């Protein structure tokens, strides 16, 4: 689905590194993805074992993610702030045979692999004592490796582990591509939108709504390795951003921080918040200060992740929105499993192609 979105705009810039300014056209991204996919298959890294990726947002993150998908592999994404113990758990649980990391997280990655000698280490950039990402490139794999798009797990993100250790969630090509299109329709995305991409790509929210949606639907990503309010505001100003994709702590900064007034955000039409609930008071404060619609959605990792979005045409403060196309919901009694009448609290059951 991402390649379908990139193919018609080979000469257009689609990813900008927000730190060093490097620019990648759609043609550049496709070329990098195909050559890395070819190298991964030639080296035997796919499809035998999942490939683990632990790095902050960057153009390379997008390339690695889609190269593994193009090669017919499975990628498991790790939080770059993990401890060595947490890294070991996910690598062992997922069965990953290769860990690709960033120079900033190389030390903790090495510590984690001291007890997992069977896992090979690769670094984005270069390091004297381990494989560099550039060394994995090979002849371009021109055609996507055929897999069952409905059943093959292309990504294995891990849940937050609120009831125990984090658990891997198997998501197929179809799950991701359908949710990308569902979200684009629900959010009324337009070609040419630029996103200040600080939402971490390792998390399903940033993965689908930020990375995949913008690459597939004609947008531009300006990658940020972490949230920085000044950089975020400058990107939104300089690129005349129509929309912000955020989380509630960022909404608080947008509502209260004096730095916001120093930037021209007049092109902004809407702010979309997800990943955690936000009350109507904060929602209204953001909408009032930025003079735009403040929208929310709902989802979870198992839903790839979006199931509900508040429509721009009918914004409702503090609400999570309406179900996306082809998504069915029930509110049932957790004790009996029977549907509850309007106004009653119960358990939300969701079913859909995502």
Indicate where each model-derived feature is located.
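Conserved AMP-binding A3 loop
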Residues: 23-27, 154-178, 310
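A short N-terminal helical cap/helix-turn-helix that marks the beginning
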Residues: 1-15
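Conserved beta-loop-beta connector loops within the AMP-binding
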Residues: 330-350
């Amino acid at each position: 689905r991402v390649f379908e979105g990139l193919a018609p705009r080979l000469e257009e810039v689609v990813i900008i590194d927000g730190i060093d300014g490097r620019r990648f056209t759609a043609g550049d991204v496709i070329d990098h993805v195909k050559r890395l996919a070819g190298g991964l298959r030639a080296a035997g890294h796919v499809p035998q074992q999942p490939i683990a990726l632990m790095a902050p947002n960057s153009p390379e993150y997008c390339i690695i993610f889609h190269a593994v998908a193009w090669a017919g592999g499975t990628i498991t994404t790790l939080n770059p702030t993990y401890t060595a113990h947490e890294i070991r758990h996910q690598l062992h649980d997922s069965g990953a045979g290769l860990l690709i990391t960033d120079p900033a997280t190389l030390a903790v990655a090495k510590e984690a692999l001291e007890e997992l000698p069977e896992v090979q280490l690769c670094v984005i950039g270069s390091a004297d004592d381990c494989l560099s990402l550039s060394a994995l490139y090979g002849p371009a794999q021109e055609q996507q490796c055929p897999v069952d798009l409905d059943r093959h797990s292309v990504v294995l993100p891990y849940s937050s582990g609120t009831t125990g250790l984090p658990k891997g969630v198997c998501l197929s090509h179809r799950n991701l591509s359908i949710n990308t299109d569902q979200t684009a329709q629900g959010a009324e995305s337009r070609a040419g939108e630029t996103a200040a991409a600080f939402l971490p790509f390792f998390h399903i929210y940033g993965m689908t709504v930020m990375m995949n949606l913008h690459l597939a639907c004609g947008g531009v990503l300006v990658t940020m390795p972490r949230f920085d309010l000044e950089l975020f505001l400058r990107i939104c100003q300089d690129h005349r951003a129509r929309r912000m994709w955020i989380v509630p702590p960022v909404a608080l900064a947008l509502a209260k921080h004096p730095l916001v007034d120093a930037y021209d955000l007049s092109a902004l039409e809407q702010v979309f918040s997800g990943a955690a609930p936000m009350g109507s008071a904060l929602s209204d404060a953001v909408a009032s200060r930025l003079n735009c619609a403040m929208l929310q959605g709902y989802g979870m990792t198992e839903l790839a992740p979006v199931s509900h979005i508040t429509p721009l045409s009918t914004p409702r403060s503090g609400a999570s929105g309406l179900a996306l196309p082809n998504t069915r919901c029930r509110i049932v009694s957790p004790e009996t499993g029977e549907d509850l009448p309007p106004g009653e609290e119960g358990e939300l059951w969701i079913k859909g192609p995502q």
